[in-house]
Amino acid sequence: MLLLLLGIIVLHVAVLVLLFVSTIVSQWMVGNGHATDLWQNCSTSLMGSVQHCFSSSANEWLQSVQATMILSIIFSVLSLFLFFCQLFTLTKGGRFYITGVFQILAGLCVMSAASIYTVRHPEWHFNSDGSYGFAYILAWVAFPLALLSGVIYVILRKRE
């Protein structure tokens, strides 16, 4: 049981790291000397040093991506906190429903953010020769992992 709990905690922390990195790092869209994330657009020189950074568009679609990514982090942190609280207060045989629901909500929020970005990014990125960066891919990787950990929490029963 201890090994199972450790595995679940490691999975949850991995999801949190993926969510934080994908939200913070400036690599959602890259190409031809520029890198774009949810917060700013940066141009780089041939040597790789950052030349100019300016705030991202105030487009409402981009703001919805920002909001849902932040919500996914909040839900996942809250889920981890609730898991530790329930670990010590839940009666024997009880299930971690609340923890699982918040983790599933985190997964759905990150899926919504990545989907909105995929569909609507041409509206605020006019450069069509770019490609998706690693932070965008990390967001998509965090989605199934968050759902998986949420389902594991819902199925998991507390033992002594």
UniProtKB/Swiss-Prot annotation:
Cytoplasmic side: 1, 92-95, 157-160
Protein name stated in the entry: Peripheral myelin protein 22
GO BP terms: myelin assembly; regulation of cell cycle
Family as reported in the entry's similarity comment: Belongs to the PMP-22/EMP/MP20 family.
Extracellular topological intervals: 32-64, 120-133
Keywords from the named record: Cell cycle, Cell membrane, Glycoprotein, Growth arrest, Membrane, Transmembrane, Transmembrane helix, Ubl conjugation
Annotated compartments: Cell membrane
Membrane topology: Multi-pass membrane protein
Post-translational modification as stated in the protein's UniProt record: The N-terminus is blocked.
GO cellular component: plasma membrane
Chief localization: membrane
Function description: Might be involved in growth regulation, and in myelinization in the peripheral nervous system.
Pfam families documented for this protein: PMP22_Claudin
TM ranges: 2-31, 65-91, 96-119, 134-156
Residues of this chain annotated as glycosylated in UniProt: 41
Alphabetized Gene3D superfamilies for the sequence: 1.20.140.150
